Amino acid sequence: MDGPAFVLADALTKLQEDDLDIEDEVLVDAQDAQTQLAAVTRVVDAVAHSCTAVQDAATFTYAQSCIKYVGHLEPDTAHRLLDAILSGFSGLLDELADTDATATSALAEPLERYAFLLQWLIQLLEKHRDTFARPKTSARGARTDGAWSWAASLPTVLGVLAKALRTVSERLWSSAAMRDTFVSRCILRPVMLLQENEAYLKVAPVKLGLFKVTCLAVKLHGQAFNVQTSIMQSLQYYEHLAEPMAELLSVLRVEFDVARLGEDVLRELAAKSFTGLDSKSPRSYGRFLVRMAELNPHSVLKQISLLQKHQDSESYPMRNAMIEVQGLLIKSLALHPDLGATDVPADGDDDTPAHRKQIDAFFERLLERFLDVTTFVRTRAVQVCNGLCDLPAAFPAQRLRMTELAVQALEDKSSHVRRHAILLLVKLILTHPYGALYGGELSMDAWSERHAAVQSRLEQAEAVLTRPLTDEEGTAEADVSQSDLAPPAMSSADQEQLVQLRLTHTYCTDALKFMTCLERGVPILVQLLASTNKAEVLASMEFFRVAYEYKIHGAIDGVRAMIHLIWTKDLSLIHI
């Protein structure tokens, strides 16, 4: 016998307000285990006989009663109940897929009943997850055969939810509001509830299932706004969701070709303001930004002009995040020059490639943070620069500036900043771009000789172009045509040689500047060998070891100063 008409929105509202009245409710919580199993079996048999049995008043009553008191059921009994709902829902979806479009509206109500039951069951199983979390064990600790855990069923549950989103369409309902209620409250809401549990996101099938359901809701059912709201709330209240939300948006862009939602989230985040008293939410938003820059740099580049305000945020976690974001964008642009070419307006007077302009701007903002008021931010800026030294691109001007700032940071009041500045100097030496022509050594004397030789050759080559007129040539100038006064045209080989000499001269000049900066830091590093901070001393020793190998002037002074430290260290190891 069919029951009264079922209105999904009303049932969900009553359930939310704890005012749901189940007609002829069965008090399953007062029954023994065998009677409870019989009640669930009645639902299982009815659904197995017909997927539309959920429209039968008695079957629907038993299903609701069993779900309401699922926390009182044995794990295996609860498992049977879940399987019955999933089986009936999946079977009805198969029937819907094979039904003519003109007759599908008749299946709307049973689908809504299944969706209502399933979202309620998910909510309560999650509430009582500790009861259904671990398989039963025997007295000896061995696992009992056939035991069930709620977490193990999640991939199947999410698979059915995804199937529902792929199968249903707007033709099922007479209004968009009814479809929105079905999708947002019966499909998306359980997914949002499940993702609040950090443990589930560590299980790949569950995590991918959550992402798939959310992406299908956005792609096929216009749930972008609801998902955007959910993401912002997740970042606000659940710190563990920072990276997963960025990964979700990446999956949505790559696998479902929907990039706009990620950009909308970034715009909303850019409009937020944080104070120095905020601690949790800026850290979560910052981690989200960093992960977005890793997975979706193009979207971040498009919104970077808005996000840039957080560079000067009162909250240091946001400043830290922007430093990492800029480092990641530099890396992305260096490896993929066409990534942001369309986002920079063309300048007719400047033929510098668009991606180089962006890289220069990001480096400028990044290096500014070496002087930040917060120790953590200064340290992060040095660390990011350290990572950028591994890029194949040379960035000679930025490397020189890094070296200057790293030497200045050797006198920072924070030992953390000093230690990372030393590590940056070591990395700058190990990855320096001045080994292509003359080998990797950085001897000031040798490079000065090379620079002088190149400069002499360059002056001789340029003298031909800039040779001044003699007095006799000046007197006869009026009688000679302008074309006759012009210097003789250079051959292509001479032009190529002149260009090569100029490049080599710049190359040698930059190398000398680099070595000069390093040598200015040597006396400070000698003093740091006497630091009380062990990590700082070890970093200084590593610097002098590397500097000595590269023949940097003054490195021998550091090596001599640290000999007693090596001896002390060896003795301490012997005593241990």
Describe each model-derived feature in a short phrase:
Residues 214, 249-253, 285-294, 311, ...:
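Hydrophobic residues within the alpha-helices of tandem HEAT/HEAT-like
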Residues 574-576:
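Conserved small/polar residues in nucleotide/adenosyl-binding loops
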Residues 51-56, 71-78, 93, 97, ...:
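Flexible loop/turn segments at the boundaries of HEAT repeats in alpha-solenoid HEAT proteins
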Residues 125-135, 164-172, 176, 503-561:
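Extended amphipathic secondary-structure runs
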Residues 226-230, 260-270, 298-311, 336-369, ...:
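HEAT/HEAT-like alpha-solenoid repeats
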Residues 7, 39-43, 58, 62-65, ...:
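Structural recognition of alpha-solenoid helical scaffolds
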